[in-house]
Design a protein with these regions (language model features):
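Extended catalytic cores of very large enzyme megasubunits
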Residues: 1-188
């Protein structure tokens, strides 16, 4: 869906005379979102995901299509994930990652991930949602089927965790408090 020629022309018309690659990229996203059509919103989602991938490649030296082993060790070696929290690498995780990777997220989900939940390095997010969700599952459940089940459910939007869990588990932070009010209709 979406007409790339139309996006390119509309982007070109909106750009100032001098623009950086990042300006062009953001303008393409804006053009897509201004269409207010799901097919263009999904193109914007791919562009937003590309920004996260570029951050990973630039700051961690690994992309989201590398083996999960390469991704995992880059996250540990660059201090993005906590070595004391993460279990020892298991080759089985390659199939887990390949299973969750094809899940396409909507634009708002990718933006929310990048803004609120992705771990940052030098002030920019350096995890795609899929990689971060694998880290959350592994950090919380270790090398178990529960880790995969949680990662998959998170990517598919079937489970929601409080922000401290989404932010902290991969870094070894299990002490952050999240507040919520739950009412059950009782008088206690």
């Amino acid at each position: 869906g979406g007409d790339w020629s139309e996006i390119a022309l509309a982007t070109y018309k909106r750009l100032p005379e001098v623009a950086k690659a990042s300006d062009i990229h953001q303008m393409m996203i804006n053009v897509c979102l201004d269409k207010e059509e799901i097919s263009y919103s999904r193109i914007a989602a791919r562009l937003e995901q590309a920004s996260l991938r570029k951050n990973m490649e630039r700051l961690l030296g690994v992309g989201d299509r590398n083996s999960f082993k390469d991704i995992y060790f880059a996250m540990l070696d660059k201090g993005v994930w906590d070595k004391g929290t993460m279990p020892a690498y298991n080759p089985l995780w390659e199939s887990w990652y390949e299973e969750i990777y094809p899940n396409r997220l909507e634009y708002w989900q990718i933006v929310q991930w990048g803004d609120k939940y992705a771990i940052r390095k030098e002030g920019v997010p350096v995890e795609t949602p899929h990689i971060g969700c694998m880290g959350i599952g592994l950090g919380l459940h270790g090398d178990t089927q529960d880790a995969f089940d949680l990662a998959k459910a998170l990517v598919e939007g079937k489970v929601n965790l409080p922000t401290p869990a989404l932010n902290g588990i991969r870094k070894g932070d299990f002490d952050t408090i999240s507040c919520c009010i739950i009412t059950g209709g009782d008088t206690v």
